[in-house]
Amino acid sequence: MKLFDCAPLSLAWREFLQSEFKKPYFLEIEKRYLEALKSPKTIFPKSSNLFYALNLTPPSAVKIILLGQDPYHSTYLKNQQELPVAMGLSFSVGKNAPIPPSLKNIFKELHANLGVSVPCCGDLSAWAKRGMLLLNAILSVEKNQAASHKRIGWEAFSDQILMRLFEANAPLIVVLLGKIAQKKIALIPKNKHIIITAPHPSPLSRGFLGSGVFTSIQNAHREIYHKDFDFSL
């Protein structure tokens, strides 16, 4: 079995990244990920959603990048069935999943900054379809084990995605929340893109609420595209 057999990737992204897929580092990622799928361990998101962030936002449509760390590793119960919270988009959860604390803080800050109504569900797919790439630096995780797939090597791949976008699309609005995401500043060409930073929205971090991050994103979007980004969900 090949990676794209169980984890579909759109033609647009396959063409955009085609030179990466035969490189040794990517073949090693593929090997390690497929081994993880075959193991008794449960891997999130489900493989069909591994590249959901890319599939919802084609490379030519990317206007904003909101970089996450790795997928949610927890589950929730629905009709006595255990389901993953992770669904392939950074910070986002499925329509029926409980809204995690970090996402609650994102919605609070969005409402405080722009007056956007706090939604009742945490599915951010609509943002992705409007040009916000909701990419996690690490694309998979083992159930109940945060950052457990760091060893797979996903960051080498996500770094290449970012660098290719930085070369191809100008200017982009790059949103980096927290110290781990902000390490990616080193990848961003100077004076070409708008970089917006803020503390991580986790309740364990301080300073996200009141940071004005969504005001900054909206101002940047107006500057580039002369209109507001639609944050409604």
From Swiss-Prot:
EC main group: hydrolase
Organism of this sequence: Helicobacter pylori (strain Shi470)
InterPro entries, per database record: UDG_fam1 (IPR002043), Ura-DNA_Glyclase_AS (IPR018085), Uracil-DNA_glycosylase-like (IPR005122), Uracil-DNA_glycosylase-like_sf (IPR036895)
Gene Ontology cellular-component terms listed: cytoplasm
Keyword RNA-binding: no
Coarse class of the protein's main subcellular location: cytoplasm
Enzyme Commission numbers on file: 3.2.2.27
GO MF annotation terms: uracil DNA N-glycosylase activity
UniProt name for this protein: Uracil-DNA glycosylase
UniProt similarity note: Belongs to the uracil-DNA glycosylase (UDG) superfamily. UNG family.
Record's subcellular location: Cytoplasm
Domain of life: Bacteria
